Amino acid sequence: MARYEDLPYRTCVGMMLLNAEGLVFIGRRSGGIEHVDDSHVWQMPQGGVDPGEDTWAAAKRELYEETSVQSVEKLGEISDWLIYDIPRTVAGRAWKGRYRGQRQKWYAVRFTGLDSEIDVTTPGGGHKAEFISWRWEPMQNLPNLIVPFKRPVYERVVKEFSALGFPEPKASVGHR
């Protein structure tokens, strides 16, 4: 087995899904080796980029595979790749011991559909559910809900997208 320091990072994408009120979708993870702390089981959709796949296409695919959501409009992206290491104690078991962490490209999108479109228990494309429940959460709360080793990434995502976490402006009604 390769030394931890020699393992590569898995190339992934993350998606911040904002509703019209400026709240962010978070899903409650169904568990997994990399979740070392049961009190921090909430996260935004994220997943791997397939070989040759564009990161924006991967982000839309992952969002659909984890939430069934397709009704979105792109608001922004973080130009940098954000990186985190998984704890050494689980590195040999997570992702079959092939990676030391993830390098992620993050996107923000506005959800333009109805909440009834969201289905985490039988997500799109027949994929295995990664979440057991979901909710809308204020953006500033996100770093405290994620496992500690991902917290710096979430802090950066919140900082970069903080201006997007406001409600959509309502159309004004003209005066007669």
UniProtKB/Swiss-Prot annotation:
Disulfide bonds: none
This protein's record includes keyword Transcription: no
Keywords linked to the UniProt accession: Hydrolase
One GO molecular-function entry: bis(5'-adenosyl)-pentaphosphatase activity
Cofactor(s) this protein requires: a divalent metal cation
Domain of life: Bacteria
Gene Ontology terms describing biological process: nucleoside phosphate metabolic process; ribose phosphate metabolic process
Motif Nudix box mapped to chain: 47-68
EC number(s) per entry: 3.6.1.-
One Pfam short name: NUDIX
SUPFAM superfamilies, per the entry: Nudix
Domain Nudix hydrolase: 8-159
HAMAP family reported for this sequence: Nudix_RppH
UniProt xrefs under NCBIfam families: PRK00714.1-5 (NF001938)
Similarity-based family: Belongs to the Nudix hydrolase family. RppH subfamily.
Job of this protein: Accelerates the degradation of transcripts by removing pyrophosphate from the 5'-end of triphosphorylated RNA, leading to a more labile monophosphorylated state that can stimulate subsequent ribonuclease cleavage.
Name of the featured protein: RNA pyrophosphohydrolase
Record organism: Rhodopseudomonas palustris (strain BisA53)
Gene label: rppH
